[in-house]
Amino acid sequence: TRIKAVLVDDKNQPIASGAHEWENRYENGVWTYSLEDIWTGIQDCYQDMAKDVKAKYDVELESVGAFGVSAMMHGYMPFNKEGELLVPFRTWRNNITGEASEKLMELFNYNIPQRWSIAHLYQAILNGEEHVKDIDYIATLEAYVHWKLTGKRVLGIGDAAGMFPIDTTKADYNQEMVDKFDELVAPYGFSWKLRDIMPKALVAGEDAGVLTEEGAKLLDVTGKLKAGIPMCPPEGDAGTGMVATNSVAVRTGNVSAGTS
């Protein structure tokens, strides 16, 4: 699998790119990537693209008009108030939430696949995992990266729908189901309610923040990249694939044969 960075011009034509090879690990019965894997991969990928820009155009890459982050959907990255990851990233590839998935399907009368973030959260609760009481934020991979680059806890609606069911009339999490979940876990006495710990769902074009000074240094280890670049809502690979193949118009569709 590769992490990819693509620079496009004002006509949406690719003009430079970079890549980094990475592979998930199977540790303690869980498919995962470490935070180090994530950031060394992103940084290496960005540098590869910056070198391509320098080689092709003899220009140092210092800013772009706008950018966004896309990554694998679903999964589970719970953080505490200090921003520390409480358990290793549980990716979409894990099938370890069968009990939670079944019970939530019954509760919501709605299909909840095992890979969805809400299934991971409820399974951790059913397992009696210590970390759940300390959760301050739950993210998917791109929600996490976007948060670190902008400070904003937001997620594009395509992958928000891979965390929890969406009310399509409101373009937001289904409030009736949110209430049912909060009621379901109330006996455990957690300090949080579900909406407190989930990223805000955004639709395309909404303000998702700008690259911060801290985020710029995280992305470009050489320090050349400038802060202040607007960022679009981060999205899952399915929605990104549809946009990239122009399959967003009515009566069009796309078939993914692997996301990379």
Indicate residue ranges for each PLM-predicted region:
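Charged catalytic carboxylate motif
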Residues: 37, 41
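Short glycine-rich, Thr/Ser-proximal phosphate-binding strand/loop in the N-terminal lobe
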Residues: 1-36, 84-91
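Glycine-rich phosphate-binding/catalytic subdomain of phosphoryl-transfer
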Residues: 32, 44-260
